[in-house]
């Protein structure tokens, strides 16, 4: 295999969990490198559905080491509930490792997150209310609690005995909320610590050893490129770095250790929460995509906003992440449509632009410029090769590859593992930079011309 990063190429919810699950078969180590319980992925294996938020998708393979790395923020209550759920389903977590340097979400983070959203009013960001932003804020302010702090009861008690009264000042003076009682929180987190203790390790050192042993490592990002703190639709973003570069910081490895980057995108576009969304459909087609695609968030249950595929943000994701290939998911959701539109550029103040604007105010005024392609009436759910697809579906995928100038290696046609077409080996196929040596072209069913 290689050391591979899987990233979302849109606003999250692209189906990264399924793709990671598929690729995990050839990996020795699977790493979640950022985010927290604000992200979720759903896996369907053998008729069983698994909904996970923190634990890497590779946990379903008992011989894969699964690491929750330093770049994540960990809610012990949710993590332990996931561990218990897996145990109830007969799945071992002996292969799970938690970075001792990851930061911990506490009750005051969740309370502040919800209170701050309410305080923002019409300027709310649409957070999940799970305390992720406040946890990362404490990390940046160097006042956070880390997993390693949980391992030392006296130190944890001392840190929380200072932190909780500090946060109570904010709760009372800024948000007009009652203060939190420190003692129950301290006792609860001491109990969490004992249950988590067997999993805690120096994850960066573990990864370094795996790299030195030439093991195959799969890095699993949460959310998506357009939610990146620096490169997303700021301020409507997450508080970490879902992009490929975030894998290095979040996991504690050097950039030369990454061999390949795979982007995951839906065959259309969705977004949860607030923020600009040029191709959003507020008509019956948008409702059809939402209903057919079961577009409800794994974490919050909120209905996702749906729209046509946006090639502008797609090209941006290719550039920002250095994508080598794409996995296109939920192609089957487009079955039955008479025509399908793809955004190829934006109109802004009477002129055409083909780049993603960094200013959210500009982005909010962008109108999509569409190319219209014919749809297909037959089902694609049972297709298992490119040749099985209706010609219109094949042409649609070819158009996306051409638009984004990156090959499509995987096509997903449903939630199950077997509802997948492997067009080209996503691990050992050509890197995008090598597709056209000496000006030549490489034949590929879904390769840009």
Swiss-Prot record:
Coiled coil: none
InterPro entries named in the record: Adenylosuccin_syn_GTP-bd, Adenylosuccin_syn_Lys_AS, Adenylosuccinate_synth_dom1, Adenylosuccinate_synth_dom2, Adenylosuccinate_synth_dom3, Adenylosuccinate_synthetase, P-loop_NTPase
Cofactor mode of binding and number, as noted: Binds 1 Mg(2+) ion per subunit.
Active site: 13 (proton acceptor), 41 (proton donor)
Entries under NCBIfam families matching the protein: PRK01117.1, purA
PANTHER family for the chain: ADENYLOSUCCINATE SYNTHETASE
Name of this chain's protein: Adenylosuccinate synthetase
Organism this protein belongs to: Synechococcus sp. (strain JA-2-3B'a(2-13))
Organism lineage: Bacteria, Bacillati, Cyanobacteriota, Cyanophyceae, Synechococcales
Gene encoding the protein: purA
